[in-house]
Amino acid sequence: QDGGYMRIQQSGWEMKRDLDRIPWCSAILTAVNVIVFLACQFYGNVLYAQGSFSILYLIRNGEYYRLVTAMFLHADISHLANNMILLYFGGEIVEKTIGKVRYLILFFLSGICGNLLSAVYELSTGSFYESIGASGAVFGLIGGLLYLVIARKGRAASISVQRMALMILLSLYSGFQSVRVNNAAHLGGLLSGFLAAFLLCHVGRLPGERARRME
């Protein structure tokens, strides 16, 4: 009986360990984006009209919720796929390194800051447009990952500073090749993600967060 109890207990620990390895936040955020995209195939006109972001919606109507809702809308399958691949696989590393609470703060803060810089760009140029997509938040994860790589003596999860820099430059370059890409949101997300990662890695334990050890 004792042997059976020990085997069950050990099996429970192994299951918990396996569950802890799953990047739940990245997985859930990816799933939500996919579900919303599928919903847009049926209710796209309503969702895009009510969820896309532009500074005009903030100034005229005070619809600040659009800073967040626009992050979960995508124009087409390639737009969604590009963002979700980076969100899941890049986010997985960040989430496992800094924890779920910090990860969520980093993700949403970067997305919001990306949209805010986009708003500043609209005001400064007088060119107003509606924008959608999670790329501001995704670039925030890339910026956060860049900080983690630098903070860990130039390498984290087999990713070097050189590889990170090349990935960022290629991503930004491809964005500037298209007039449809919101590069202001990309830059805003990237910079805020880097800064947020620095700040989040130097604060104490957050509410709802288990004790952890930073390597």
Stretches found by the model and what they are:
Residues 3-215:
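A detector for small-residue-rich transmembrane helices and their helix-helix packing motifs
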